């Protein structure tokens, strides 16, 4: 009888343990199912990412060769003025896609036909939206520079056309004809110029004062001429100052030209005149007209002088910054 009682007690203990274990197993299974369901409803990491492929918009056809320019590409998150991602490539076709979280962004592309040490800008993801591009030596050859932008929102496709193209520089053609044989050299200093522009296309002066650019004209027989890319002039001024320095051996004379208007970006201006007019001791006043970047114009085939031909001009060196 005692053995039987002991056996029954053990059986009841075993059944009791099983009954206590069953709710715990059920709870574990339910939690496991809920966790699996949550995982299935949670988006994969790839669904949170977005590939942005920058391309030049079709309107870039008006900018010959732009696709082969070196490009610095900045990606800004619209919630911040800080650059989120940056890359540089030798041409637009060499750019890599940006892979980022889905959000609202803006692309800014700075394109130049060549890299030069005297054009300084922040070429990294340390850039800001108001980061500036500064020409540190205006007398050196200035490259063609074009700014392009694009807005990027969540509902666009992967390919993002960079449009809103803005050429940041202008060009000036100068041609003096019928130059006297004893003239050995001619220099032109164009004043009232900007030397800095930011990534939004706003110009200013790095020193707080207008800059200038010296251009040496090339002699071919009795013609002195030059073509130069330059930064635009201060649009708040009524005219542009041009100082011609005419050399006869080591001696020189200075002549001042005031051009009505401004020298704009994205325009080509051709200034042509007979040297016998400009070499008179008088202040010259001309009106500027403009043409597209890939065209040229002639303002006049001679220079107009004012009535006072008795002005005395200093031969002191001109300030060239």
Please describe what each predicted stretch is.
Residues 91, 114-160, 250-282:
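Structured interaction patches on ligand/partner-binding surfaces of diverse proteins
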Residues 67-122, 184-267, 313-321:
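Tryptophan-paired
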Residues 248-321:
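Hydrophilic extracytoplasmic domains
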Residues 29-32:
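C-terminal motif of bacterial Sec signal peptides marking the signal peptidase cleavage site
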Residues 39, 52-64, 176:
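Short amphipathic, basic-aromatic surface patches that mediate peripheral association
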Residues 34-37:
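Bacterial signal peptide processing site
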Residues 3-20:
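Bacterial N-terminal signal peptides that target proteins for export
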Residues 162-169:
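Conserved "repeat-terminator" motif of extracellular CCP/Sushi domains
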């Amino acid at each position: 009888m005692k053995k039987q009682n002991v056996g029954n007690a053990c059986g009841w203990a075993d059944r009791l343990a099983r009954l206590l274990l069953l709710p715990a197993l059920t709870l574990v299974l339910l939690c496991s199912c809920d966790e699996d369901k949550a995982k299935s409803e949670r988006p994969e990491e790839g669904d949170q990412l977005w590939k942005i492929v920058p391309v030049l918009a079709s309107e870039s056809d008006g900018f010959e060769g732009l696709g082969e320019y070196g490009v610095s590409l900045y990606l800004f998150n619209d919630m911040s003025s800080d650059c989120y991602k940056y890359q540089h490539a030798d041409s637009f076709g060499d750019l890599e896609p940006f892979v980022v979280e889905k959000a609202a962004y803006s692309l800014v592309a700075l394109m130049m036909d060549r890299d030069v040490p005297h054009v300084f800008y922040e070429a990294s993801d340390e850039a800001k939206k108001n980061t500036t591009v500064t020409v540190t030596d205006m007398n050196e050859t200035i490259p063609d520079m074009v700014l392009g932008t694009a807005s990027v929102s969540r509902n666009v496709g992967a390919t993002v056309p960079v449009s809103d193209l803005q050429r940041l520089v202008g060009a000036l053609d100068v041609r003096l004809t019928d130059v006297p044989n004893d003239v050995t050299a001619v220099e032109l200093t164009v004043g009232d110029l900007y030397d800095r522009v930011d990534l939004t296309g706003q110009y200013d002066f790095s020193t707080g004062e207008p800059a200038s650019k010296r251009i040496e004209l090339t002699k071919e027989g009795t013609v002195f001429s030059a073509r130069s890319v330059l930064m635009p002039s201060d649009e708040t001024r009524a005219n542009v100052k041009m100082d011609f320095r005419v050399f006869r051996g080591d001696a020189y004379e200075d002549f001042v030209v005031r051009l009505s208007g401004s020298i704009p970006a994205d325009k080509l201006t051709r200034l042509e005149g007979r040297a016998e007019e400009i070499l008179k001791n008088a202040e010259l006043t001309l009106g500027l007209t403009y043409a597209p970047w890939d065209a040229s114009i002639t303002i006049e085939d001679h220079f107009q002088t004012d009535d006072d031909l008795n002005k005395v001009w200093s031969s002191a060196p001109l300030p060239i910054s």
